[in-house]
Amino acid sequence: MALSAESKAALVKEFQVAEGDTGSPEVQVALLTKNIEGLQGHFKAHIHDHHSRRGLIRMVNQRRKLLDYLKRKDAARYTSLIKKLGLRR
């Protein structure tokens, strides 16, 4: 399920690095994580929805790339982000 505008704005406000920041890796990873969590519930009910599963895998891969980039550029920001989001690693 897609995020509502209010929940997306709240996530951006929570994870932004500077005022008006919507494109930092932290914000992008947070938005992808919430979308992924929403889709996981969908797949519990719709096991054979392979078309949407492809989109889920694409989001997971994009999040992984952003996390790898952040880990390479600034390890402290990376560790604080995964702790805040509760991601494994």
UniProtKB/Swiss-Prot annotation:
<keyword id="KW-0687">Ribonucleoprotein</keyword>
<dbReference type="GO" id="GO:0019843">
    <property type="term" value="F:rRNA binding"/>
</dbReference>
<comment type="function">
    <text>Forms an intersubunit bridge (bridge B4) with the 23S rRNA of the 50S subunit in the ribosome.</text>
</comment>
<keyword id="KW-0699">rRNA-binding</keyword>
<keyword id="KW-0694">RNA-binding</keyword>
<dbReference type="GO" id="GO:0003735">
    <property type="term" value="F:structural constituent of ribosome"/>
</dbReference>
<dbReference type="Pfam" id="PF00312">
    <property type="entry name" value="Ribosomal_S15"/>
</dbReference>
<keyword id="KW-0689">Ribosomal protein</keyword>
<dbReference type="InterPro" id="IPR000589">
    <property type="entry name" value="Ribosomal_uS15"/>
</dbReference>
<protein>
    <recommendedName>
        <fullName>Small ribosomal subunit protein uS15</fullName>
    </recommendedName>
</protein>
<comment type="similarity">
    <text>Belongs to the universal ribosomal protein uS15 family.</text>
</comment>
<comment type="subunit">
    <text>Part of the 30S ribosomal subunit. Forms a bridge to the 50S subunit in the 70S ribosome, contacting the 23S rRNA.</text>
</comment>
<dbReference type="GO" id="GO:0006412">
    <property type="term" value="P:translation"/>
</dbReference>
<dbReference type="InterPro" id="IPR005290">
    <property type="entry name" value="Ribosomal_uS15_bac-type"/>
</dbReference>
<dbReference type="InterPro" id="IPR009068">
    <property type="entry name" value="uS15_NS1_RNA-bd_sf"/>
</dbReference>
<dbReference type="GO" id="GO:0022627">
    <property type="term" value="C:cytosolic small ribosomal subunit"/>
</dbReference>
<comment type="function">
    <text>One of the primary rRNA binding proteins, it binds directly to 16S rRNA where it helps nucleate assembly of the platform of the 30S subunit by binding and bridging several RNA helices of the 16S rRNA.</text>
</comment>
